């Protein structure tokens, strides 16, 4: 199959599974129908495969996974040969993946990959099977699964990420020479593209992790001397920062300071802020950011001040960080709902909200309650407080976890050596999450510039 056909199918699947938002009205209708579509023993009555898939997808889109699986199981039981079985298998596996039950997810993802290898669901199943193995710490096995993807689907939708995942999986397995070999394979296959740059950035990260400062500097220079940043998940500022960090660790302080100083200082670059901090610690005073513009000041208001101060004070969370997340998540719109069924000011998904509702004082929480500002802020504050404890107060890791999941953030932090903010940010493995971290931390930097911890204007 040609890559264009792959892409068309890929877009269709995610239009169908991830981005076709089921409205709250549709969810209520399906929930009501299911109450009356049951046999005497409480089991779902047999419906058409299409109807089971529709209802299951509606629950899936709203992250009500146990309810979605009831319908997917009925498809597998009643219609095992129907084309809907592939979707039922894949979404069942994905639901367990979202619930972090990776061992159970593998059962369904492996099955859809084996039984439907010529479909998009099969290809996606194989890819997510590898991801599950990574999250279980089975990195060598994950590398083999990703390599299988490269052999079976050389033009697959995830062929670039499969190569990059092999590099990181081999690195995490301690197979450094094999990881470096895959850096070269990736560079050859994707020469002149952002994927080649990502492979080189992975090499920089690996060398920093291993304390090979000279090799980290050399890899960074290879990128800076002509790599393509378009389509990559890194930037000139990030690579300069990593190079400066390697130089500093190697004892080349003046060259390190010169490299940090070459990063333009403004409030829109995450790494410029880190560079300023490192320069300031060394006594340098030439890296002062430009004053905030009138638009930057007006775009960062204090909203819901009383509620934020009430619930952040309890857990010693910086209220400016809550505002930074709120701005990014909903632009302060209390009625916001995402395609992934995240609701309200801080875009809570129902399964997360249910976990913290009792601690927050809302034991009878219903989905629509998350549109209430006080409820949303209270529950999100409980969640963020737990993340703060888990990640030792590293706000970059908290932001990454809020967007990309606790287990992913923990894995990125675990492979960050040293556990420094900029090193962690460079290790974030999802493009969306990495961009999210940068935006939240830039927001946080501006809020700290504008307001004190009581949210009074400076």
Which residue stretches match the model-derived regions?
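Short solvent-exposed coil/turn linkers within tandem alpha-helical repeat scaffolds
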Residues: 42-47, 75-85, 113-123, 150-161, ...
